[in-house]
Amino acid sequence: MAKKKSRTPAPPRKVQAPQRRTDPKRPRSPEDRRFLFMAIGFALTGVIALGVAVLFLFVFNDSNKAAVDIPNSDSLVGVQTGPAPWNAALDTLPGRLEPLGLNALTNEGEVVHIHQHLDIYVNGKKVTVPSQIGIYDGQFLTELHTHDASGIMHVESPTKRKFDLAQFFGVWGVRLTPSCVGGYCKELTPWRLYVDGKAYQGDPRALELKPHQEIAIVIGTPPKTIPSKYKFPPGL
């Protein structure tokens, strides 16, 4: 029997690694570019709008913020909660300054130096705003005060800041809340606050004091005419 020839195995074939397909990059069409620019534009517009909204809320809240956190006037020492007339309540003035955010000054401030006029009517009759409100026995005066009984309010501060009606009434030592002035509360005696002859709709305590305002508090039956302006003396 013939001997079978052994076959030499064929050498292994080289296996080529898969090649990454490299198609030439298709240039963007004008429509593609236009869509891309529009998408970027919308994104930027959204970012800008969000920034403006945040800025508006910050500025709005800051501009409407009260000069200080308004204290409960009933908690102020020596506050008068009875009917008019009301005195200047000077004996207890030092104890009211800190909760009102005010200071005992040796001189009138000049950084803020503005004036307002205050009228108060009870059933058509004018109530006197006392002289020397906020001036303590010649020892000190505070940023908000009066020099006479004309109703002129003096706001004189050594630092730039805002002041409100709550602070003036706190210095005066007369209760002022959203519903009560002194002993007059809206549940029993209606009253309204007017600024330059127009009814004020907000919290009366938060009214910011500005130059040459005519402020009128009308309790009960109003006078024939609500004052809308006041003729300040020269220099005020």
Task: Give the residues covered by each predicted segment.
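Ubiquitin-like/PB1-type beta-grasp interaction modules and other compact soluble beta-rich domains
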Residues: 2-4, 8-32, 37-236
